[in-house]
């Protein structure tokens, strides 16, 4: 299994599939899956390529999900090895996407391949959902595939996403949920004028200070057993023309909340509106909900994943919901149990991204054992 995983991972890394480009990665994967009897369905949306590949019928349906797109490399000269060389040095596979997530995607594919070879008449259905739009807007990728499947009344019971979940060593963390993410773009109105005549103007920076203080110190909740407390961060703030003699006419503020299951997006919107009204601010606001929080409590998939990780790594993993959003937020809308498990995330999105080849081999074994536990 290890040889096939590493060989496929290298093939994928050598294709510079900067999001939302796929650059032939899914074609490589689809040929392998077709050769072992998977039915292929291409779902292109906009500039994004998506693959839905299935084997078998009936319940339960377990999905292996991943993405072929990657983030840009930055200056290649800063890399120890060329970012698309997929070179192996001291059992470490180097290249953009090695850890996030072409390595674990290769492990998912080979695990599924090996499983259907051994169990061609397995119970239930195995599906692979692969997209080229996870790292960028994530609008035409998994979200659109899920919309299509729901419109066809298809069902997903379990989903394993190969995102790099581990922190210190392989097997320390399984992600069984994610916080919600919502962003606001707020424009606070003032009246532009000359700094020497403040009585003829209204400075939106000055009028917003009390609001900003309350916004950034407000305690949204205390979190719960599964999630840390909701947090808010201002990401961008702008006002003024750049001249020192002009009072700005408008202040622009962009802030993001990562929120837990104790509140929802409607509570967030209403709370902010109440704050703005309290300070008598004139404003325009636009909200963008990236994803609602989801949680897969201990059930068949979580338990099967824990067991497989313990069997292969000899470590007992911790269930965790920290970190950013993932495509799990879309799959969870179908009522599926969702877990994320993959290699270490220490180098993702960084110069000199790399992953242990031994860890990728173990990921493949873990994914294979999850299939065995749920479909045999």
UniProtKB/Swiss-Prot annotation:
Its EC number is 3.5.1.18. Zn(2+) 1 binds at residues 67, 100, 163. The keyword Transcription does not apply. GO terms for biological process: diaminopimelate biosynthetic process; L-arginine biosynthetic process; lysine biosynthetic process via diaminopimelate. The active site is at residues 69, 134. SUPFAM superfamilies: Bacterial exopeptidase dimerisation domain (SSF55031), Zn-dependent exopeptidases (SSF53187). Binds 2 Zn(2+) or Co(2+) ions per subunit. Belongs to the peptidase M20A family. DapE subfamily. PANTHER family: ACETYLORNITHINE DEACETYLASE (PTHR43808), N-ACETYL-L-CITRULLINE DEACETYLASE (PTHR43808:SF31). This is Succinyl-diaminopimelate desuccinylase. It comes from Haemophilus ducreyi (strain 35000HP / ATCC 700724). The gene is dapE.
